Amino acid sequence: MDFGLIFFIVALLKGVQCEVKLLESGGGLVQPGGSLKLSCAASGFDFSRYWMSWVRQAPGKGLEWIGEINPDSSTINYTPSLKDKFIISRDNAKNTLYLQMSKVRSEDTALYYCAR
């Protein structure tokens, strides 16, 4: 039997199991002054052990860090200009990160990403 081939298959399967996935949802159109809650479903890693962040990218601009939350939600840090508008939370039982947006304005138009 070719042990090199067996090792390759095992390594390949292990790689598939360790694939990190972050899937954002909840975006859409909202009226000025309105609110919106984004979700980020995580898989492929132990979500409850990691700090998680939200970042955004407005059209034609670079990435802007919104904030981060520690594994047990006891520490949450925000970009100062956004801390009164956005609330970051998480549910470790559901492997999900949240971004509650309020007082939304046109300058909040962006692609929003969660990050580990």
UniProtKB/Swiss-Prot annotation:
Matches recorded under InterPro entries: Ig-like_dom, Ig-like_dom_sf, Ig-like_fold, Ig_V-set, IgHV
GO biological process, one term: adaptive immune response
PROSITE patterns given in the database record: IG_LIKE (PS50835)
Signal peptide: 1-18
Listed GO CC annotations: extracellular region; immunoglobulin complex
Occurrences of domain Ig-like (ranges): 19-116
Domain of life: Eukaryota
Keyword check for Nuclease: no
Keyword Nucleotide-binding: no
Keywords assigned by UniProt, alphabetized: Adaptive immunity, Immunity, Immunoglobulin, Signal
Protein name (Swiss-Prot/TrEMBL): Ig heavy chain V region 441
Species classification: Eukaryota, Metazoa, Chordata, Craniata, Vertebrata
